[in-house]
Amino acid sequence: MTKIFIHLGAPKAASSSFQYFFHFNEKINFLGIIRDHHKYKFSKEYNSDFHSYCRHKNNYYNKAKKIKKKLLKNKINLISDEDFFTSQFANFKKKIQRIIKIFPNCEFIVVLRHPIETIRSWHDFDLRRFQGTPIDIIQYLKLNHKEITIDLLNYKKRINYFKKLKKNKFHIIDFNVVKKKQIIQILEKIFNTKLYTEEKNNIFE
């Protein structure tokens, strides 16, 4: 059986760095998207139908499941999209169920950052990007469109949900290991294989 891993983010937990690493690593068949805030970069195997279906932007199951044809037996198959972990467009549970419908035995990977650090990161980002963003972080969190961000920080709810899945492994990575540059060893343990890395392509160094 060909293994498939789903990297869920979380947002503001080095997701773009992970996606760049997955994209350039020779041992990984990367089927995801790099969201780097400047522009999206797609892997050549990227399947927009799968991502849109799982995010509940459409109901085209037959198109979405064609992504299975892009799996490789001799590589680590990996899909990444941090929106799968959020409740934007649809509740995160519904998104995960759509993923499982296509990949019943997939393994999930999530990187969790301290909630306060995550909020500060979102706030700093929005201050740079959006004119009129409140400088006061309490006022910032009271904005209507920040309900999704606040919900995202309910890690306990999400962890409890994933633990109840019977056929799917759930790997949690502490964001601190990324900061300590220990992430390659963690990923190798999850994938159960040595990852080929070149200095120029190892964005974690």
What kind of feature is each model-predicted range?
Residues 1-85, 106, 184-205:
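PAPS-dependent sulfotransferase catalytic core
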Residues 2, 28, 172-174, 197-202:
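A broadly tuned "polar low-complexity/structure-edge" signature
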Residues 9, 32, 132, 201-202:
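Residue-identity detector for glycine
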Residues 66-69, 73, 94, 164, ...:
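Intrinsic low-complexity, intrinsically disordered segments enriched in polar/basic residues
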Residues 90-198:
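PAPS-dependent sulfotransferase catalytic domain
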